[in-house]
Swiss-Prot record:
Domain of life: Viruses
Gene that this sequence comes from: rev
Keyword RNA-binding among UniProt keywords: yes
Protein name (database record): Protein Rev
InterPro entries: REV_protein
Compositionally biased region (Polar residues): 22-34
Amino acid sequence: MNERADEEGLQRKLRLIRLLHQTNPYPQGPGTASQRRNRRRRWKQRWRQILALADSIYTFPDPPADSPLDQTIQHLQGLTIQELPDPPTHLPESQRLAET
């Protein structure tokens, strides 16, 4: 079971990295030499950022399954609403005087 979870986590990371690479296609199109050069320069800057982001995604460790947050969530899911007593049918004397 743990190997399957690790494999699914790796596949999720690889899909995200692939999506990042697809969002930055190599620049093509007409234009002057300086326009093409600037497009390539900006593309190369984005490419370096994507590589750094992909590296951090791939190397970032998955949080442990029994982290304090997960334990807290499991504890909160086990809570139920208790039966509350019926509300009083008449107001106390001090509140009746305050309303008038």
